[in-house]
Swiss-Prot record:
Coiled-coil zones: none
Name of the protein in question: Dihydroorotase
Keyword Hydrolase appears in the UniProt entry: yes
Cofactor(s) it depends on: Zn(2+)
Length: 414
C-alpha cells in the first residue's frame, strides 16, 4: 500500500473513523481496521475527509483573457478551495465552437491544470464535436454568443447540455433581467426535455418560481444547480455594491430563502466562478469569483445547521458524477483517490489577498467563517496543504461513461 489516509470520513451517510488505502492513485481499500502503508496521512480530530469535490460550472478565461484568469491561476484557486475537478465553460475568447479550438484548450489544460477537468463545447448553430459536455446560452451573457434556435442546438448535442436559462427576448426588452426571464426559459427547457428526452442541466437557478417549476417537473433527464452567491447574497447587497453584478442577477430575500428551504431537493451546488479584474467590474462586467469561497461558505452553513456535510458531498460529488457520467470518480474501490480535507472548527476571515484567483477581489471580503479546506488530494497526491499549492500541474481530463442514464430520485417522466 503506497498511501494510507487515517481519520474521520463519511460512509453510507454516517461519519466514521477509519482508513483509506491508496495504490497507483486509486482507492484500493476502505476499512474500519488499520491498513499498513508506506506513507500515512493522519487527519486529526475536528477534521473530516470528504471525497474530492467537483465544480460543474467554472469560467477559467485564458486565451485572449488570461489577464482575468488563466487555467493555471484558476485551477490553483480550485484546489485551494478543495475542488478536485472543474468543468470548463466554453464561452471563452475565442469561444470553443470548433474542434481546433477545443484541441487547443485541451493542450493548455494538459500543461497548466492543477485540477482534473471536463472540457465544454459551445453550441449556437454550429456543428458539435465530441466533448465532455455542451453549453447553450438561451440569452446573451459574457461573450455575447447565444443560441438563436435553442431546441435545434439542444437536439444536436452529443451528450448532456448545461443551459444558461434566461430568455433572449425578455432580457433584450428588460436588461435588468427580471425573474420572468429565467422562468420563461425554464419552461422552454422543460418542454424540450419532455419531448426529446435528452439530458439537460440548468445552471444557476435563482428564483423561487423557477425552482418550483423544476421540482414539479420531476424529469429524470433534467437536473439543475444553485450557486453560493444566490444562496448567500441578495439584491440589497448589489444595491450597496455594484461589483456584485452577475447573470442571472442577485434576487430578493424571498427568493434566497426559497432556495434554502428546498436545499435538500437541489441536486447540485456549483460556483459559476466568473472572474473579472476590478477595472472590468467597475466598467460593468457581470460575474463573480467563487472557486475559493464556495466550500468555506458551505462549511460555515454546516456549522450553523443550515445543511450537513452529507448534503455537500451529494451536491458536489455524488450527483455531479451521476448527472455528467464521470467514470473514474467516486468514493469506492478502483476510483481516483481524490479527497477534500476540511477543518470544521477553524475560524478565519475571507480576504482577497489570500486567494489565488487573478480577480483580485471577492464578494465576501471580511466575512468571518467557521470551516476551512486544509488539504486537497488528487489521485493520491497532496496538491494543496494549508493554503500552499504543492508540486507541478498534474490535472487530467475526466473519463466519461458511455451512454449513461441518470436517476436522481424520480424515475417518472411526465
Amino acid at each position: 500500500m503506497e498511501v494510507v489516509l487515517e481519520g474521520k470520513f463519511l460512509l453510507d451517510k454516517r461519519t466514521i473513523e477509519g482508513y483509506i488505502g491508496i495504490e497507483d492513485g486509486k482507492i484500493s481499500k476502505i476499512s474500519l481496521r488499520e491498513i499498513k502503508g508506506d506513507h500515512k496521512i493522519k487527519v486529526d480530530k475536528g477534521k473530516v475527509i470528504l471525497p474530492g469535490l467537483i465544480d460543474v460550472h467554472v469560467h477559467l478565461r485564458d486565451f485572449e483573457e488570461s489577464y482575468k484568469e488563466s487555467i493555471e491561476s484558476g485551477t490553483k484557486a480550485a484546489v485551494h478551495g478543495g475542488i478536485t475537478v472543474v468543468f470548463d465553460m466554453p464561452n471563452t475568447k475565442p469561444p470553443i465552437m470548433d474542434e481546433k479550438t477545443l484541441k487547443l484548450r485541451e493542450h493548455l489544460f494538459k500543461r497548466k491544470s492543477y485540477a482534473d477537468y471536463a472540457l465544454g463545447f459551445l453550441l449556437a448553430g454550429n456543428k458539435p464535436v465530441e466533448a465532455d459536455f455542451y453549453k447553450i446560452f438561451m440569452g446573451a451573457s459574457t461573450g455575447g454568443i447565444y443560441s438563436k434556435n435553442f431546441e435545434e442546438d439542444y437536439i444536436r448535442a452529443l451528450d448532456i447540455v448545461s443551459i444558461h436559462a434566461e430568455d433572449y427576448e425578455i432580457i433584450q426588452k428588460y436588461p435588468e433581467r427580471p425573474p420572468i426571464a429565467e422562468i420563461r426559459a425554464i419552461e422552454r427547457v422543460i418542454e424540450a426535455v419532455k419531448t426529446h428526452k435528452k439530458p439537460a442541466h440548468i445552471c444557476h437557478i435563482s428564483t423561487a418560481k423557477g425552482l418550483k417549476l423544476l421540482l414539479d417537473s420531476r424529469l429524470e433527464m433534467l437536473s439543475f444547480e444553485v450557486t453560493p452567491h444566490h444562496l448567500f447574497l441578495t439584491r440589497s447587497d448589489y444595491d450597496k455594491n455594484p461589483l456584485l453584478k452577475v447573470y442571472p442577477p442577485l434576487r430578493s430575500e424571498e427568493d434566497r430563502i426559497a432556495l434554502w428551504k428546498n436545499i435538500d431537493k437541489v441536486p447540485v451546488i456549483a460556483s459559476d466562478h466568473a472572474p473579472h479584474t476590478l477595472e472590468d467590474k467597475e466598467a460593468g462586467a457581470a460575474g463573480l469569483p467563487g472557486l475559493e469561497t464556495e466550500v468555506p461558505l458551505l462549511l460555515d452553513a454546516v456549522n450553523k445547521g443550515l445543511i450537513t456535510l452529507q448534503d455537500i458531498v451529494e451536491k458536489m460529488h455524488i450527483n455531479p458524477i451521476k448527472i455528467f457520467g464521470i467514470e473514474n470518480k467516486g468514493f469506492e474501490k478502483g476510483k481516483d483517490a481524490d479527497f477534500t480535507i476540511v477543518d470544521m472548527k477553524r475560524e478565519w476571515t475571507i480576504r482577497a489577498d489570500n486567494l489565488y484567483t487573478k480577480a483580485g477581489w471577492t464578494p465576501y471580503e471580511g466575512w468571518r467563517v467557521k470551516g476551512k479546506v486544509i488539504m486537497t488530494i488528487i489521485r493520491g497526491e497532496v496538491v494543496m496543504e494549508e493554503d500552499e499549492i504543492i508540486g507541478k500541474p498534474r490535472g487530467e481530463r475526466i473519463v466519461k461513461k458511455g451512454k449513461h442514464r441518470r436517476n436522481l430520485g424520480s424515475s417518472e417522466e411526465h
